[in-house]
Amino acid sequence: MINDLRTVPAALDRLVRQLPDHTALIAEDRRFTSTELRDAVYGAAAALIALGVEPADRVAIWSPNTWHWVVACLAIHHAGAAVVPLNTRYTATEATDILDRAGAPVLFAAGLFLGADRAAGLDRAALPALRHVVRVPVEADDGTWDEFIATGAGALDAVAARAAAVAPQDVSDILFTSGTTGRSKGVLCAHRQSLSASASWAANGKITSDDRYLCINPFFHNFGYKAGILACLQTGATLIPHVTFDPLHALRAIERHRITVLPGPPTIYQSLLDHPARKDFDLSSLRFAVTGAATVPVVLVERMQSELDIDIVLTAYGLTEANGMGTMCRPEDDAVTVATTCGRPFADFELRIADDGEVLLRGPNVMVGYLDDTEATAAAIDADGWLHTGDIGAVDQAGNLRITDRLKDMYICGGFNVYPAEVEQVLARMDGVADAAVIGVPDQRLGEVGRAFVVARPGTGLDEASVIAYTREHLANFKTPRSVRFVDVLPRNAAGKVSKPQLRELG
């Protein structure tokens, strides 16, 4: 019997007790009631235990939004382990680095997906801790999921005990977020934090078991995992995963499933609004949308309300180190407030603006710390418990936060954080590049995209196409610069550091 309800296994147990026959999950090829979802989770958890996964182990998922992701994630928690989501856009090199540092013994990886075979692309020799790879079928019947489940037939009895032993303070997940030095950091969050933050997010949107939630946001991101899977788990809302965003497919899904909840970055709504077939679909069921992660024009919020007929449109601000949360607008806020601010603190957060303008957050949902990096943890969370976000902002008289700049030069491309230092390190290794710097520039569809400024060595014949092609080989697509400017020298300040403001002036 699970007594403490502040764990993911407890949340699923409660859902089954309260809504046993309620539709919990709808995928392209399968539907799950709450009870059927619990049974599938127990089967996968038993298989993990049979494969030798121990409590506090870290198990990774490198796959898109299918029902397998949901089941695998919850199964990892039931086995007492922590889930490590990997961005599906990562290259094999990027994924290998994270898997190595996490010491993951098991990986759920997509088979053929968008022209790449992630499971086959890994260098297993570089990952001695990785004992098992479970292939998740996405575009082809090339998975090993059924074989994986079969291995757990003799371990089902062990699952309940494992699940009951999970404590609220145990680490539930490790999401990796790029750092200003260019190397990713693993953010440790506990069960109580992940559940508390996602429950607060759902409460702001008044989400209930009557809602149907189309999850376009990727599960490897807090917006899809905590504001998606865990929010539905705690409210009973029906989760409908969307594998890859396509405006027409999304419009069909909204009409077919009578979708009420549709979060996503601004580009999602812009694509739906601009689609020539939009008026052919009944979108009247839409009720609640949350956007952010980029500049949001007032006119977009107004069009979402008037043309998509969404009752509640909110914006929010958060970061991985705060469980993806921080501030959020409220249903009663007007379109201007929603578009021009990030709202007020929620999820038990306190907000303060430091003397230098940096946004600080404090509360029980600030991360446990960074994986194997006490120095970085101490730098991020001060002695008084304030999380230093690296963002510059201001608070208006109503308490709404407005982000005005980023201390760390990070920009957001299509909802994904990009740290220039990581891209710059890749460019520095390219033959013919003497110096390089990267900034984010506005883009109508993606919010911001990268622009590289390159100092080429004489006689190398570098051009824009070759630089972009090189970075695409080594980085995820959203990190790849979309344009290149060649300059004789990079502008630097008195301390010898590249002056990003001057680069922005150069365009």
Curated annotation (Swiss-Prot):
Q: For this protein, what is any one GO molecular function term? A: CoA-ligase activity
Among the GO biological process terms of this entry, one is: cholesterol metabolic process
Please name the Pfam families in this protein's record. Answer: AMP-binding, AMP-binding_C
Record carries keyword Methyltransferase = no
Where is ATP annotated to bind? Answer: T177, S178, G179, T180, T181, G182, R183, S184, K185, D391, R406, K497
What's the stated role of this polypeptide? Involved in the catabolism of the rings C and D of cholesterol. Catalyzes the ATP-dependent CoA thioesterification of 3aalpha-H-4alpha(3'-propanoate)-7abeta-methylhexahydro-1,5-indanedione (HIP) to yield HIP-CoA. It can also use the hydroxylated analogs of HIP, 5alpha-OH HIP and 1beta-OH HIP. It requires that the side chain at C17 is completely removed.
Tell me the protein's name.
3-[(3aS,4S,7aS)-7a-methyl-1,5-dioxo-octahydro-1H-inden-4-yl]propanoyl:CoA ligase
